[in-house]
């Protein structure tokens, strides 16, 4: 149990270090943050100054019917890019939320860039 608590503390410190480095999202450049569970992949676009979620997308949405794999996460990036373009948002700050930048995280960020969002 002690190892689990120590790992949790390390993860929290890593998240804080990353968040301090990237800064806060503002209205003209909000922060996009990702979360991976064992089954789903969640993404939120957050305006930290106002404390509002501007857009969100996840693999759990019924109309998308996606799984947590690289191809579906790329589709998720395209869907989020379309929603952001509808709201006239073209620049984001990418918050990987303590995860390594590879696999699902990297493919999601790449799909956002390919869709025309400046990350």
Swiss-Prot record:
One of its GO terms (molecular function) is 5S rRNA binding. GO terms for cellular component: cytosolic large ribosomal subunit. InterPro entries: Ribosomal_uL18_bac-type, Ribosomal_uL18_bac/euk. Part of the 50S ribosomal subunit; part of the 5S rRNA/L5/L18/L25 subcomplex. Contacts the 5S and 23S rRNAs. Belongs to the universal ribosomal protein uL18 family. HAMAP family: Ribosomal_uL18_B. This is Large ribosomal subunit protein uL18.
